[in-house]
Amino acid sequence: MRRIENTAQFKRDYKRERKGLHRTTLDTELIPILNALASDEPLESRHRDHALTGDWKDHRDCHVKPDLVLIYRKPDEAVLQLVRLGSHSELGL
């Protein structure tokens, strides 16, 4: 299982989402995704996990909810780095 690292921006994004629209379901939706990513298990197709391009070329994103996106990367075999969390417009996607 990979060790999970949170960037400072992810921590701010998570705190914002915990107070916002997704406050009641954020943890119940996010924790199973994080467990699957940390264990290198495939995500369900509804999460639309895919690689990003351009400035985000070494990152991937998946949909926690239809307009709640998790950007992450796996820099090596032991680490899962959580980079951003937010809507498409907040993240500039």
Predicted features, each with a name:
Residues 1-66, 75-81, 90-93:
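Basic, Lys/Arg-enriched alpha-helical interface segments
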Residues 72:
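Acidic, metal-associated active-site segment
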Residues 86:
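Residues forming the ATP-binding cleft of Hanks-type serine/threonine protein kinase domains
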